[in-house]
A protein has these predicted regions:
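Terminal low-complexity/disordered tails
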Residues: 142-144
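An alpha-helical support segment within catalytic cores of ATP-dependent transferases
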Residues: 7-18, 135-136, 147-188, 198
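Short, conserved clusters of charged catalytic residues that mark active-site
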Residues: 22, 63, 168
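Proline- and acidic/polar-enriched loop/turn elements at helix boundaries
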Residues: 28, 83-84, 139
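Short, amphipathic alpha-helical segments
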Residues: 110-121, 138-140, 156, 160-167
Length: 198
């Protein structure tokens, strides 16, 4: 269930008064997802998705929201965060960071065919091209620091052969000079439930 933080229509209506989206018409929790609370929101001005962030902090989120806005401005079909009346993409709801973004059409496909996979690959290439002009950066949240703290915790659950494979990979990762590789923002969360197809 992806509604970890419950919100009433009255609470959301009050929050939406800081936006130019019109009156709230419908609020519906979204059951899919594993990390954030999500609602479908319909207002007088359109259909949106409200996300209440359960793990990421208000300090971490501007990078992601600004990147989404950048991609949307460059024609990538992704949710576009909506700014409030103070031109801020990130708000706070029930003491947690929250944003509202445009709702895309389409549906997730659990068994995509070859043509759909090819279309997703082409869109991902367009995302990477559009991302080249995004000037903000952030450290890789699954980079060397994360690997160094996570590998020992995972290792405890592995048999000898799996542990040796993990150790070998961690050693390889530590010996690789990633600074010599091309740099850029990637999706890093691409899976079937996260792609909407017409």
């Amino acid at each position: 269930m992806a509604v970890f933080t419950s919100i009433s229509e009255a609470e959301l209506s009050a929050w939406l008064s800081d936006y130019s989206l019109g009156d709230l018409q419908n609020l519906q929790g979204i059951a899919s997802g594993i990390e954030n609370t999500n609602y479908f929101v319909t207002t007088a001005n359109g259909r949106f998705v409200l996300t209440i962030f359960e793990k990421l902090t208000a300090q971490e989120l501007p990078f992601y929201l600004n990147f989404m806005a950048h991609l949307a401005r460059h024609g990538i079909p992704c949710p576009a965060p909506v700014a409030n009346r103070r031109n801020e993409l990130l708000g706070e709801l029930k003491g947690k960071p929250a944003c509202i973004a445009t709702r895309l059409s389409g549906a997730a496909t659990l068994t995509p065919n070859a043509a759909q996979c090819a279309a997703m690959g082409a869109m991902l290439a367009q995302l990477h091209i559009a991302g080249q002009s995004f000037t903000h950066t952030m450290p890789n949240p699954r980079g060397s620091i994360w690997r160094a703290t996570t590998a020992p915790r995972v290792r405890a659950y592995l048999d000898g052969e799996q542990a040796a494979l993990l150790d070998s990979e961690v050693e390889f990762q530590e010996s690789t000079d990633f600074a010599a590789l091309p740099q850029g923002v990637i999706h890093a969360d691409l899976f079937r439930d996260n792609v909407l197809l017409e």
